[in-house]
Amino acid sequence: MEEGSLWRQWTMFRSLLSILQWWGFNVTVIIMNKWIFQKLDFKFPLSVSCVHFICSSIGAYIVIKVLKLKPLIVVDPEDRWRRIFPMSFVFCINIVLGNISLRYIPVSFMQTIKSLTPATTVVLQWLVWRKYFDWRIWASLVPIVGGILLTSITELSFNVFGFCAALFGCLATSTKTILAESLLHGYKFDSINTVYYMAPFATMILGLPAFLLERNGILDWFEAHPSPWSALIILFNSGVLAFCLNFSIFYVIQSTTAVTFNVAGNLKVAVAVFVSWMIFRNPISPMNAVGCGITLVGCTFYGYVRHMLSQQQPGTPRTPRTPRNKMELIPLVNDKLESKI
């Protein structure tokens, strides 16, 4: 009896620890990226994304090949180009759009907009795959959309370009989720193996555009910045932490239930919003805060509805279900793929 009690306490402690370290890495990566764009004046989102991809490629190789902390999931060479490469392309676009939006709009606004991802995923699955969704799923999306509309209307630091980048980032995230269900069918990828295969492709895809479009700007920045080497160390550290974030996602998925994962994910957004406001002091109106709150409550309610419907007895109409390991595919920068690098 006492052993059972100790085991439950250890399980709860491990779950809490996994959530806290996930929050810590996620919030730190977001704040560091915003700091790089705003405080260090390094306004080159393609290069920032490329650094993150390189660090993640190296980190995944070390974890799987050197330290052997995770077994390698073997992928047929043909499937790497036929399945992994298209996923890597969408993944690359998703991360770049997230960093572009972070350059132009506050963290609080960007994180709130990304909460639209469940809605865009449902709509795309309905339009493209003609999947059936219970009316309760559609109803649960109303507060999410309403909250984001209220937040957008009342945002004091609104920027059209940043808003569009975040919005298209949601569409890219949703597309990635839908593609994962078909292209990665048969492969049980965890977040580390996903990074191992996709990050090198993403580096290859983004390397040339980053070099051609941002090379001159980076050289000018390097000459004008008072301490460029210190800034580059911060940039490199943000890439290392971005990989650590993926490792923390694997840990939290293994240590929590689906409901806990959903609630913790939405609370994580609230933590990121609060911490970013404490650091950058971007103006937030009362109605803007209300809109953000409505959105987060709506996301939590949406997760609850999906979980409730997934537990229905066989034979009862069910909604399409996304496995938890596809809910947050390698957010090398932002966490939610329903986020994420």
From Swiss-Prot:
Entry superkingdom: Eukaryota
Subcellular location: Golgi apparatus membrane
Tissue: Expressed in rosette leaves, flowers and siliques.
Main subcellular localisation: Golgi
Keywords (A to Z) from UniProt: Golgi apparatus, Membrane, Sugar transport, Transmembrane, Transmembrane helix, Transport
Any Gene Ontology biological process: nucleotide-sugar transmembrane transport
Gene Ontology CC terms: Golgi apparatus; Golgi membrane
Disulfide bond residue pairs: none
Domain EamA: residue ranges: 33-152
TM region positions: 17-37, 44-64, 89-109, 141-161, 192-212, 233-253, 260-280, 284-304
Membrane topology field: Multi-pass membrane protein
Family assignment from sequence similarity: Belongs to the TPT transporter family. TPT (TC 2.A.7.9) subfamily.
Protein purpose: GDP-mannose transporter that may be involved in the import of GDP-mannose from the cytoplasm into the Golgi lumen.
Name of the protein described by the UniProt record: GDP-mannose transporter GONST5
Species assigned in the record: Arabidopsis thaliana
Name of encoding gene: GONST5
